[in-house]
Regions:
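Core segments of transmembrane alpha-helices
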Residues: 2-4, 64-73, 125-136, 160, ...
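Structural signature of hydrophobic alpha-helical transmembrane segments
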Residues: 22-30, 86-98, 147-156, 273-285, ...
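Membrane-embedded alpha-helical segments that form the functional core of polytopic membrane enzymes
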Residues: 22-33, 60, 64-116, 203-218, ...
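Short juxtamembrane and helix-loop transition motifs at transmembrane-helix boundaries
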Residues: 47-54, 85-87, 107-119, 142, ...
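Extended, low-polarity transmembrane helix blocks
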Residues: 201, 220, 235-289, 295-358
């Protein structure tokens, strides 16, 4: 299939460019194979039950994610033509976006078909890390992210390397407590990178947004490292209560206050310069609907996604304005954490937690 895509690429690029694409994509697909093959014995729910008969549709979708990431990664071999051959960027963005969608549904399909497995869980984590290694580098070449976002690309590998070093030095490695937030933050990184690869979104906005997506994930890795190294014990009653209090304060105080602040910021921005001067009517309606959704807590995450799309597509507020920063980073916080208490309808929160929490 990669060879077929290479031939397809020759319709838009010279053959001497499609050949390097094929080489890098093939090497990445080989890596996908090498990551998968030694883990086939994990194609079961746990060690006490027999292996499943075949991979199943969910694992096939996960492997397809690896293939799509490889196809996207091939563009790293042809950076010189990315600005001139826009169709190549569109294809790469589409490939990674489909991979991100598969990441959202493969676990759901595994549960619906009764084929959840250790193999699927491991490959899911490995391909998340691979995708967040490949796609951000491509986004950096396109000028869509700041170089510091590459810390997200290496964070997982540094974390795993740190654990192996502790094990090699006979130091204890403590277990992590289950966390829905950990998986949610990682999943939204894929979504962020998938969006910024698309050409229409403004680089000035996507670079800033990267800070809002990056810092919570890196903070999570730091906390997790403190846990596995024994500096924090989330199972100890006092420290467990501290984490619960932080979560409670976030849900009951911080996020509701953020929604009020966002609504006020949009109202102030509107009074200073009505959005109709810079946006067409459908875009203005999207802004108003998205802000109302977040203010009322009605599918607030979906509202945050809508507002972020508008800000990145054609922002009605100058990027240099403090109000823009408020709108951008509060929307990202709501997308990652939800609207919190005093929300009218939080089905999107339940969907995110159900999908990411398994």
């Amino acid at each position: 299939m990669l060879f077929g895509m290479s031939l397809f690429a020759t319709l838009f690029t010279p053959f001497n460019h499609s050949l390097p694409w094929l080489l890098i994509s093939s090497l990445l697909w080989l890596l996908v194979y090498l990551l998968t093959r030694p883990r086939l014995h994990l194609n079961r729910i746990d060690a006490s039950v027999p292996l499943f008969d075949g991979l199943g549709w969910a694992n096939r979708m996960t492997l397809a994610r690896g293939w799509l990431i490889a196809a996207c990664g091939g563009c790293l071999a042809i950076p010189a033509i990315l600005e001139d051959a826009a169709v190549v960027v569109w294809i790469a963005a589409a490939a990674y976006s489909i991979a991100a969608i598969f990441d959202r549904v493969d676990g759901f399909i595994a549960r619906k078909t009764g084929r959840t497995s250790q193999l699927g869980a491991e490959l899911d984590t490995l391909f998340d890390a691979l995708g967040l290694m490949v796609a951000p580098v491509l986004a950096l070449l396109l000028g869509k992210i700041h170089w510091s976002y590459l810390l997200v690309s290496v964070a997982y590998y540094l974390f795993v390397a740190g654990i192996k070093i502790r094990q090699r030095n006979k130091l204890p490695v403590y277990p992590l407590a289950p966390s829905q937030l950990r998986r949610t933050l990682a999943g939204f990184q894929m979504g962020y990178v998938a969006v910024v690869l698309w050409p229409p979104f403004d680089a000035g906005v996507t670079v800033l947004a990267g800070v809002g997506f990056m810092l919570p994930l890196l903070s999570g890795f730091l906390v997790d490292w403190c846990v596995v190294s024994g500096r924090i014990n989330p199972f100890e009653p006092t420290q467990k209560a501290l984490f619960e209090n932080i979560k409670r304060a976030t849900d009951t105080v911080a996020m509701p206050a953020a929604r009020v602040l966002l609504t006020a910021a949009v109202c102030v921005a509107w009074s200073a310069d009505p959005f109709t001067r810079t946006l067409d009517i459908p875009a203005v309606l999207l802004v108003l609907v998205s802000v109302l959704m977040m203010a009322a807590g009605v599918a607030g995450r979906a509202g945050a996604m809508l507002l972020l799309m508008v800000l990145a597509w054609n922002t009605p507020i100058a990027v240099t304005e403090p109000l823009f920063y408020l709108c951008l980073f509060i929307s990202i916080a709501i997308l990652l954490l939800g609207c919190g208490r005093y929300s009218l309808w939080q089905h999107d929160d339940h969907w995110v937690n159900r999908q990411d929490g398994a």
